Amino acid sequence: NQKNGQASSTTGTIYGVYDMSGTVWERTAAYVANGNGNLRGQGASIAYNGNTLKTESTKYTTVYPFNEKDSEGNAITNIDTASQQNFVANSKIYGDAVRETNSGKAGTSEDGWNYSSWTSDYSSFPALGSPFFTRGGNLLNGSSAGVCAFDRNSGGSYYFGGFRAVLVNK
């Protein structure tokens, strides 16, 4: 029924955005520029210009700085620790709904999964072999899926991943 369908959009009309609660982890054009092989293997079209890793954001891609070293300058190999370090390294970045909707240190609970975004949405900052941002969550995340949820991803395909088309007005 079209009338009931319209009620589920953000505007209440057929022109609104549907399914803001998350049914898949939505891929984004955002990553930490840590040089991990998955950036080239899974995201060369957005992360590389020829053989050069893009380390600055563009009109269509958001690039985050990274800090995957411990206090002694050694490379961190634990993804949860690296996730926390990268979250801290990006503490001055606003406008992407990560800091604005997060009340804690993403990805830093004891088991590496954190629910510190608004309404206890899932939050884990990209790091190491999972340098890409995904948003939203899927049905397996239950009430932790939502508009404020974000996660790290390797860039590989999986059954609960998708994307959202975005129209850019020129």
At which residue positions do the language-model features occur?
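A short, polar/charged loop-to-alpha-helix boundary motif
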Residues: 34-44
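C-terminal, surface-exposed recognition/capping segments
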Residues: 3-7, 24-33, 52-170
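Short, well-ordered junction/capping motifs at the entry into regular secondary structure
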Residues: 1-21
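Generic detector of bulky aromatic hydrophobic side chains
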Residues: 14-18, 36, 132-133
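Eukaryotic nuclear/nucleolar intrinsically disordered, charge-dense low-complexity regions
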Residues: 39, 47-54
